[in-house]
Amino acid sequence: VDEASVVNELQKMEEEHIICGYHTLIDWDKAGIEKVTAMIEVRVTPQRGMGFDKVAERIYNYPEVNAVYLISGGFDLMVTLEGKTLREVSSFVTNKLSTLDQVLSTKTNFILKKYKDHGTVMVDNSKKDEREMMA
């Protein structure tokens, strides 16, 4: 397949929103930049005739929010976001998310360590954990 055909096919898939975007995956630890990643479970009251779509739209329009998913289980939505500090994430939950009329409750989970993200292994396996070496 020649390069022009690949470029044309990619452009067509972008126009048809088959390819929705491109993302850069950054290891913030290696970059020396502190980031706090949170996964927030949200229980909401769905709107008549709109279901969860309207409240999900309100949430995903906040610039801090990276992703919003409709989920099964005890909560309805999963919201992921990154902040500079725990306080910044807490402020978002307290002042923006929990104040929405449809939001009944939230449960915030902080990411302590990323092992794999978007299909990419984020740990350096060449450095064995000391506990493994002792075994």
What are these regions (language model features)?
Residues 1-135:
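A compositional/biophysical signature of low hydrophobicity enriched in polar/charged and small residues
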